[in-house]
Amino acid sequence: MKRFVLLTGCFCTLFAPLYGQDNHYESLQLGSKNALLSGAALSHWVDPTAVVHNAATMMDAKEAGIAFNSTTGGFDNIRFDNGLGEGVDIKTSDFQLYPGLIAADLPLFKQANKYRLGIAIFARVSDRTRFTNRSTRIQNIINDVEMPGSETYIGQYTLDIDVRETTAAMGWATRLSEHWSAGVTAMTLIRNQRYRENFNANAIADPTLSPTVDVVSSESDISMKLNYILLQMKGSLAWKKGPWNLGIVLTAPAMKMYSGGDMIAQIELTNIRPVDSLNRRSYFASAYLEKLKPKFKYPVSLSVGVSRSFDDLVLSAGGTFYGNIDRYVVVDPGNTSFLQPPTEDNIIFTQRFLEVWASNRPLVNTSISAEWMLNPRTSLMGGLRTDLHYAEFIEPVPLGFQLPKKIWNRYHFNAGASLNGARSRWIFGVQYSHGQADDYRQPYSFDGASESNLLQGERSKGSIRANGVTGIVSFLFYVNRPTE
């Protein structure tokens, strides 16, 4: 049993979290105009994407329309710097083409003044993170009795994460009174998640110095695919009187309709001498988990938006509260044997190594925006919104591991213009995003490698900054627009 206690400490070190996956609720705004206006659709009708933001505002639409929205592309840069010249500086850049959106809101024939229907298909999450690094150096890692002189150290790290979530929404709105409208939206979410993380390091002896140990190495490799179908409901209210608009939206927690996935994990330790042991041993752990039933949760949320119209200006502000989600198990490995060869004793450690868990903290995101009408066919738009991360850390850290997350708050600055035609409207804009965390733990390191840390190096803390620029474009076609 002592052998497994030693391995628990070693293997949990290999599964230390690296943060790179999405954990923001509002990185992608639905609809180009709403993205530029930073959530103004909470309080008043902006475009046919109202079915997603606040279905009740569809009753204020003056025309029926179909919107085709897409970002032309986004460039993200992430850099870590501990400020001490130690460890590894992480520099990664990625150019992405984001999926588009199609949405429509339509009057229900002769009941147009009482009811409206909205539909939409859009990308709710689109996040790809790729990173690879390698280090080769001459370093004295192993004691000189077994490996005289310095060893050749080779370390490699690879991370590849892809998260895509596509949502289909259908909503209905009705007028309750002169000033009040109500709406409801049903959303079906299809979420696909791919994750691969590999770390391997080797300390190779100089054969000319007659070592008693030729090589010491460690490697961890974990890969998983997780798929979900979720259902989420929204209820909304809209109030309009004179130049003022108010919107309230309550979103229920997501309900799982289907989930599936698989995971393959492997750890190899070669000629490792664990702490408090005088003997070297090699260890091997491997498991393939299939037909998994993973879990994924979205919390309850409450949104409130307000806007006021002036002669040629509309000012909007809004906020959304997201509830917390207590720690839950995303992937339960069951009784699969991980440590090899399998025994009755080592099965109890599988859950500690391979269990994936998540926990979301409560937060509030806010936004402000302005739209300035230059003339009946042209307007300028700009806005600012916060996009706080929802990762929550539990002390002491439970065994198992979290999927990687971007643990920095983001702030989005938007600007653009709207050009209206007789039966259409074009919107062009740009979004600049900035995120930063000043007490961020370096996710991996090749410096300070030793047997006590399984050749992984010592991870320091420093500042991480993420900057991105995204182009935004959309086309709106009016089905029946009143003559101006």
Task: Please identify what each model-predicted range represents.
Residues 13-14, 65, 189, 253:
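Single-residue recognition of alpha-helix boundary sites
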Residues 18-125, 254, 406-408:
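N-terminal, post-signal peptide beta-strand-biased segments of exported outer-membrane/organellar beta-barrel
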